[in-house]
């Protein structure tokens, strides 16, 4: 094999790999600030036994937007009409962007959902009802919800960290993206509004994992 043949093989392999990556694309969604509430906080904010009102399903099976809204407050500022996502959880959690943390005046860490140990608290308000969480404020780590079938196609494992190229008006490669695999999931990548603005995200935008 001469040098030209060898180069052609390398080029063909690279092209094949890129084509395979682009075939395994998934939709990228932007998540705005939102709250997950436990039964304890629901009772405190809305009254004992109150049931959250579902108004719209989300892309992840079983998760939904609630009609109810609350205020999230920090030492420097607050956000009104913050959406609550259901169903209720075992522990309350508030997810915001980096920009939001500066407005609130609270230095929240980047964490995976549910990993709230050692995170700062924040105040939740609904009218005269006020609850101050001891912890639970996070900036959500960018992540991909993935079915086991799509994980096989993409050759990734649960909790693996990958790079993702997001196509759009400002194409961008996101590093440090965690893959979360479950048969309960639908395959979508989630980023926050800061990240969405950085890549000029539009509805229906897609991304793919880089190897």
Swiss-Prot record:
What is the protein's name according to its record? Answer: Phosphate propanoyltransferase
Q: Which GO terms describe its cellular component?
A: cytoplasm
Its Enzyme Commission number(s) read 2.3.1.222
- Which Gene Ontology MF annotations are present? acyltransferase activity, transferring groups other than amino-acyl groups; metal ion binding
Which residues bind Zn(2+) 2 per the record? Answer: 143, 145, 190
Which EC class is the enzyme in? transferase
User: Could you tell me what this protein does?
Assistant: Involved in 1,2-propanediol (1,2-PD) degradation by catalyzing the conversion of propanoyl-CoA to propanoyl-phosphate.
Q: Which branch of life, at top level?
A: Bacteria
- Keywords assigned by UniProt, alphabetized: Acyltransferase, Cytoplasm, Metal-binding, Transferase, Zinc
Its chief place of residence is cytoplasm
Please give the biological process terms from Gene Ontology that the record holds. propanediol catabolic process
Which InterPro entries does this one have?
PTAC (IPR008300)
Keyword Methyltransferase attached: no
Q: In which pathway does it act?
A: Polyol metabolism; 1,2-propanediol degradation
Catalytic activity from the UniProt record: propanoyl-CoA + phosphate = propanoyl phosphate + CoA
The disulfides recorded in the entry are none
**Which residues participate in CoA binding?**
30-32, 76, 197
Protein's cellular compartments: Cytoplasm
Q: What is known of its domains?
A: Formed by 2 beta-barrels, each is capped on both ends by short alpha-helices.
Q: What's the cofactor?
A: Zn(2+)
Q: Where does Zn(2+) 1 bind?
A: 34, 36, 95
- The answer to whether UniProt assigns keyword Hydrolase to this entry is no
The note describing how and how many cofactors are bound reads: There are 2 Zn(2+) ions per monomer; Zn(2+) and CoA bind inbetween the 2 domains in each monomer.
